[in-house]
């Protein structure tokens, strides 16, 4: 084999390079097919956990416990209460009426006291509800000396350091004594504080009258006082019609400024996983998912062992590792939630007169849903790894990589100005406008300004001079100047990339053309394409030769043209596409000689045409 047949960089022969190319194509197609099967299985698994009834169950429970009007005040509900008096009205009215459904139409008895309540006649109240209070100690804040004679008591905001652990009030019942928090229980993030488990717990009864009497007793003995900072109402429901649990938490916060803030959480989750035939089909998809996870982990370990440190230089490999990590976390959360659900349901069946802490399960189940949602997001993003062989996607990736430095520099300048305006808005309007009440809210408010969703009247009313100045200058510098600079950077770089591609720069191979070429090869093997191509080629050659004879060319010129055509066809056959080719395709000595002779003949023809044009121009003059 001559030396010219070896690739100068790696000494790769023509045959080896072709074999490597075909192997890379086959590997890519196999990996794409396998990944699509995994993605379809993941979609079935993910959407199989979501039930449209979840929204409607949350909606109906929200309307019952959050939007029901208070007694003697149709304009107020749990959503809008702002005082302790209104809170007790809610506890003794809409809450009790919503929890205890003891009669059917016409006052027909619906259930006995030993059984659970059926909310809306379809949702079983699991166990008994629980009311929990968190308090802070007196004298937990510092009072200015001049006001110490006027202020004898001082209750600060809720923190773990300020929390009150001592008994208070009557001190004879559990609701007046402190219950330690569980280390594994999740914390709750409210409007004005972050609250942990434990506190002063009131366990309700299955009897509506007993529960109402207990609420009246707590109200008369000031169970909620100045030291109260949060009251939680927790209970859980189960709807067998749709096999869904609804875990409900109503929260009333009593900030140190006075007043009352309410919030709520409704979690509809499917804790009993395998009930119907469709559930068992989802279970089979879960098994397949675990098999895929095991196979992908083995593949990535082999790649790491083969490429060593070079493996970590690819962005797609980092995405692959992130995807595997998320899949592993999803499997771990799923196993933990199922195990805890089994244990908790067993305890509930043994003792129906206790409070079942399903909020703990809902908390971890929501984390599982979030992890699986992020997993499927990155799983779809990974498709770009395969379609990046397309010319358009290659141009997009080249554009982003080429303008990355400019984008980073622009981002630094943008966030400096953006942060400056956010601090200005927070300091000027924070005490009067809800959108600027915190620094985080100020940042989101500015993004809303960019999107055109903003209440200008609010900042104008807060400060009629600085409000319009802030708004106009922010729109001018951020919206008209900076965002257009960003678009100009992207547009200019994309134009450069388009120009590079127009003069011959292409991706190594395009997936669409590879699939098209594979289909053509199959058709040729089936003798559906090959015969037709030969027929057209023969007819085209015959027509050209006959036309040349009619135009007066002699046989030597015709034979020379046919020889040049054969050389051209041989080169085109080897380099079948300018869009799918290697940057270092090997050329043999014979091919180089034919290419050189072809170029010489083209130069002669060009010179001949130039002389003819000169003669024609002289005749015209």
From Swiss-Prot:
Keywords, sorted A to Z: Coiled coil, Glycoprotein, Ion channel, Ion transport, Membrane, Transmembrane, Transmembrane helix, Transport
Glycosylation sites: 115, 138
Coiled coil: 521-551
Tissue specificity note: Expressed only in testis and heart.
GO cellular component: membrane
Subcellular location: Membrane
GO function terms (MF aspect): calcium ion binding
Residue ranges, Extracellular side: 53-277, 336-360, 428-468
GO term, biological process aspect, one: monoatomic ion transmembrane transport
Membrane-topology descriptor: Multi-pass membrane protein
Top-rank lineage group of the source organism: Eukaryota
Presence of the UniProt keyword Lipid metabolism in the record: no
Chief place of localization: membrane
Cytoplasmic-side positions: 1-31, 299-314, 382-406, 490-621
Ranges annotated as spanning the membrane: 32-52, 278-298, 315-335, 361-381, 407-427, 469-489
A UniProt-annotated Pfam family: Polycystin_dom
InterPro entries hit by this protein: PKD1_2_channel, PKD_2, Polycystin, Polycystin_dom
Family classification: Belongs to the polycystin family.
Complexes and interactors: Interacts with TRPC1 and TRPC5.
Task of the protein: Exhibits a lower single conductance but no spontaneous channel activity. May function as a regulator of calcium channels or a channel component involving Ca2(+) homeostasis.
Protein name: Polycystin-2-like protein 2
